[in-house]
Structures are given as structure tokens and as C-alpha cells.
Amino acid sequence: NQEYVQATVHLQHAEKFTVAGEYVLPMRAVFYDKDGNKHNIAGGEVLIPINVVDIAFANAAATPSGTMIPGSNYQLSLSTPLQYGTIENLTDGDTEQYGYLPHGTSTLTIDLNQTTTVKGIRIGMYILTGFEYYTDKVRVYGSTDGAKWLPLSEDIRLHETTWNNINATKSVNVRYLKLEFSVSDSYGSLSEIEVFK
């Protein structure tokens, strides 16, 4: 007779988690009776996984500083094919040449060909009245070897505008970037990817 319960945990001393990584907190499930007495639940030991992220990218109003890397200097690969358009549209400099990501989660991997100090990313979306299919959010990961990935952001909400700016909040040195897009509608517009160093 087991049940699953979804809960939110607020840590009293979150500042103790200073190193990014995965932690497991052992906890005990308890309940309080109508008189306010605390009771341990038999077999109520709970292990709560916590993933601590060192935030390095955040949504910004300003275009990333630095120099835009030409699209011909890096390679893109998608975990799922675009529903419309081609992957080449994402680096052609034209926001009116676009593609649609499918519903759900899609991952775009960017190989910069060498370790690079990344100052920001711009994500272009095609805005078309009557066909309001937009990508909801993105999460950024980075890697130096393409095998071990570190989360570099929380979910970043994308605005329904032609350009969304994601700026580095600290020094980021990676060869690979992975953008994990979430689409809640049938499709999510994606027209351009620009990387700044």
C-alpha cells in the first residue's frame, strides 16, 4: 500500500551547498496527530536527491557582449529532427528562415571545435501571426569533452520575441554547449542560434 507524494523541500541552510553536484538528503517521514503529537512513520525513511547547479547563464535584455562566432565555425546537431525547416536555417543569419521543434523536449548540441570562453547565446524565433507556436524554455549545459555535461542554468523562460538573449553571468570555458528546449504546444519556433565569445 505504498503511495507517492510530491513535495517541495525548503532548506534552512541552503548556503551549505557550495559545490555544484548531486546530493542525497536522508529524511524521515513523520505525521502529527490531532493533538499535535509527532509520530515516526514505520518504514518512512526517505532519500531526497538534490542537484545543485552553479548558475552561469541567465535571460537578459541586452545582446551578449563580445564577438559573435560565425555559424560556419561550429557544428549543430539535434536530438530530434525539426518538424519544418532544416538545421542549416539555424545559422544562416535570417530569422525568417525557421524550423519547428516538436512537442516535448529536444536537445541542440553545439560543437565549438575548441574550448572557448562563451559570453552568451542568442536564440531567434520566427514570429508569425496566426501561427503562434513558440518554444517555452531552455536549459543550458556545457562540456569540455562532449561526454560529461554540467548544468549551467536553470530553466530559462523564452519570450515570444524575435530574439532572446542569454548572457553568461560568470566565466564559462567549454567546447560543447547543449541547449535543452521544452515545447508545450504542438510545435516550437526556432530560427537562429548565435554564440558569442
Give the ranges of each region predicted by the language model.
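A short beta-strand element within beta-rich, extracytoplasmic domains
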Residues: T116-G130, L179
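Short, surface-exposed loop/turn segments at beta-strand-coil junctions that are enriched for proline
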Residues: Q12-A20
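Disordered, acidic Ser/Thr/Pro-rich linker "stalks" and the adjacent N-terminal cap
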Residues: N51-N113, Y126-Y133
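Trp- and acidic/polar-enriched beta-sheet ligand-binding modules for extracellular glycan
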Residues: H103-T105, G130-K197
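Interdomain boundary/hinge segments at the C-termini of tandem beta-sandwich modules
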Residues: I48-D54, V195-K197
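Aromatic sugar-binding surface patches on proteins
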Residues: Q2-H10, T162
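Extracellular Ig-like/FN3 beta-sandwich strand-entry sites
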Residues: Y4, A20-V24, V172-V174
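Beta-sandwich strand segments
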Residues: K34-E45
